[in-house]
Amino acid sequence: YSVELFASDLASVLDDAGWDTAIIGGASMGGCVALTFANMYAERTVGLGLIDTTAWYGETSIADWEERGQKAITTGMNAMTGFQKTRWFSDNFCAENENIVEHAVEVFVANDPNAYLETCRMLGRCNQSNALRDISVPCEIVVGEEDYATPVAMAESMHQAIVGSNLTVIPKARHLTPLEVPKTIARILLEIDIG
C-alpha cells in the first residue's frame, strides 16, 4: 500500500465519473490521500479539504504505526476497539450516539488484520510535508479540538505551510469529526471558493 497508489486510484475514479477536476477532501488516512492527490494531480485539484489529518506523523511514525499494526496481528481487531473509540469520539458523543459509534466499531473490526498492518505501515511512511508549500488551491483544514490522533498542532503546522488556507478547530470534537459534526464539515467543504 502507498498513499500514491490510493491517489492514483482516486484519479481513476474521477476518470470513470468523467470529471476532469474536483474539490478533493479526506479525513484521517483519507486526508493523507487527498494531500497526495493534490500533489500528484495539481491540475485536477480545484480545492482541498484536509480533515483530522496530517502531512506527517513525526520522527517516530514508522515505529509507532508498526507497533499498532502488529497489535492487530497479535491481539485481533476487537481488542483495539476501546482505544479507537476514545480517539474517534468524545465521551458525550459516545453517550448520545450509540448507533453511530457501534457502526464505526463494526466497520473497524471487519478489517483484515494483515491489511490493517499494511495500512499502518503506509501511514508510518507517509510524509507529505514538502508538498504543503506547493498547494495553491483553496484549502480548508479542519480538526477536532480534542483530536489525539492528529492533534491541533499538526493542523496548525499544515495551515502555516499552505498559503491562504483556513483552519477550523471544532470544539469538543475528536478524530472523526465527519461523524461527530457532519453538517459542520459539509458546510465548510461547500464553502470552498473555487471561483
Model-derived features with residue positions:
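Catalytic active-site module of serine/aspartate enzymes centered on a nucleophile-bearing elbow/loop
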Residues: 164-195
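Active-site-adjacent alpha-helix of alpha/beta-hydrolase-fold enzymes
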Residues: 156-165
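Conserved alpha/beta-hydrolase catalytic His-Asp/Glu region
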Residues: 59-64, 75-134
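Flexible "cap/lid" loop of the alpha/beta hydrolase fold
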Residues: 35-40, 44-81, 88
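Active-site loop/oxyanion-hole signature of alpha/beta-hydrolase fold enzymes
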Residues: 1-25, 187
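Gly/Ala-rich beta-loop-alpha elbow adjacent to hydrolase catalytic centers
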Residues: 26, 30, 34
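Conserved alpha/beta-hydrolase "acid-adjacent" motif
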Residues: 148-154
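Short beta-strand/loop motif that positions the catalytic acidic residue
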Residues: 135, 141-143, 147
